[in-house]
C-alpha cells in the first residue's frame, strides 16, 4: 500500500510538533527538510538559517542535493539589495520568484565553492548589507518570498522565511532541493530516509500554515 505524505511524516509527530522540532533545529544551527504539498511540486528541500550557515552545511547541499542553492529573502530585503527579477515575464508553473543571481565582491575566488557561496550569503544578509557589495550574476540564486508567507503562497520559499521568523532568526534562509543518487528528484519516502540518515526533522509547508493559524487564534 502506498502511503501518503501525512502518513509518512506522522513518525515525526503532529503538525504542530513537527514545526516546533524544526524551530528548535534551526535555532541550534541545524537543518530541516521541508516538503511542499503532494499536489504541488511534491519535493523536499534541505533548509538552513543564514545566521548559522556553515561551509560544511553548504557542502552537503552541493554534494547531496541539486546543487542549485537558493537564498530566500523577504520582498523588502530583495528590494533593498536591488535584486531585480531574473526575467521580466515569469512563466514558471509555480511562479518561483528568482532574482538575478549574486556573488560577493570581496572574500571569494571563483564564487562556486561551498565556502565562497557561504561568504556571498553572509554578505547579502549581514546587518547593513549594501547593493554595491554584490556582483551580478553569480553562483547564489536569491528567491523573493511573498508577503504573507505560506498563507499567501504555499512554496518552499515562503515556508523557509516563515520558519526563520517563527524561530526569531533573521528572516532569510538557504534551500536546495534533495535529489536521489540517480539524479531524479527525491519524493517523500526518499526525503524521510535522507532525514533519518542526517538526523534532521521533517515538516511540511502545510504544517507551517496550520501552526501560524493556530498561534494567531
UniProtKB/Swiss-Prot annotation:
<feature type="binding site">
    <location>
        <begin position="153"/>
        <end position="157"/>
    </location>
    <ligand>
        <name>D-ribulose 5-phosphate</name>
    </ligand>
</feature>
<dbReference type="GO" id="GO:0030145">
    <property type="term" value="F:manganese ion binding"/>
</dbReference>
<comment type="similarity">
    <text>Belongs to the DHBP synthase family.</text>
</comment>
<feature type="binding site">
    <location>
        <position position="41"/>
    </location>
    <ligand>
        <name>Mg(2+) 1</name>
    </ligand>
</feature>
<dbReference type="GO" id="GO:0009231">
    <property type="term" value="P:riboflavin biosynthetic process"/>
</dbReference>
<dbReference type="GO" id="GO:0000287">
    <property type="term" value="F:magnesium ion binding"/>
</dbReference>
<feature type="site" description="Essential for catalytic activity">
    <location>
        <position position="177"/>
    </location>
</feature>
<comment type="function">
    <text>Catalyzes the conversion of D-ribulose 5-phosphate to formate and 3,4-dihydroxy-2-butanone 4-phosphate.</text>
</comment>
<protein>
    <recommendedName>
        <fullName>3,4-dihydroxy-2-butanone 4-phosphate synthase</fullName>
        <ecNumber>4.1.99.12</ecNumber>
    </recommendedName>
</protein>
<feature type="binding site">
    <location>
        <begin position="40"/>
        <end position="41"/>
    </location>
    <ligand>
        <name>D-ribulose 5-phosphate</name>
    </ligand>
</feature>
<dbReference type="GO" id="GO:0008686">
    <property type="term" value="F:3,4-dihydroxy-2-butanone-4-phosphate synthase activity"/>
</dbReference>
<dbReference type="GO" id="GO:0005829">
    <property type="term" value="C:cytosol"/>
</dbReference>
<feature type="binding site">
    <location>
        <position position="156"/>
    </location>
    <ligand>
        <name>Mg(2+) 2</name>
    </ligand>
</feature>
<comment type="subunit">
    <text>Homodimer.</text>
</comment>
<feature type="site" description="Essential for catalytic activity">
    <location>
        <position position="139"/>
    </location>
</feature>
<dbReference type="InterPro" id="IPR017945">
    <property type="entry name" value="DHBP_synth_RibB-like_a/b_dom"/>
</dbReference>
<keyword id="KW-0686">Riboflavin biosynthesis</keyword>
<keyword id="KW-0479">Metal-binding</keyword>
<feature type="binding site">
    <location>
        <position position="45"/>
    </location>
    <ligand>
        <name>D-ribulose 5-phosphate</name>
    </ligand>
</feature>
<keyword id="KW-0464">Manganese</keyword>
<feature type="binding site">
    <location>
        <position position="41"/>
    </location>
    <ligand>
        <name>Mg(2+) 2</name>
    </ligand>
</feature>
<keyword id="KW-0456">Lyase</keyword>
<comment type="pathway">
    <text>Cofactor biosynthesis; riboflavin biosynthesis; 2-hydroxy-3-oxobutyl phosphate from D-ribulose 5-phosphate: step 1/1.</text>
</comment>
<keyword id="KW-0460">Magnesium</keyword>
<dbReference type="Pfam" id="PF00926">
    <property type="entry name" value="DHBP_synthase"/>
</dbReference>
<feature type="binding site">
    <location>
        <position position="177"/>
    </location>
    <ligand>
        <name>D-ribulose 5-phosphate</name>
    </ligand>
</feature>
<dbReference type="InterPro" id="IPR000422">
    <property type="entry name" value="DHBP_synthase_RibB"/>
</dbReference>
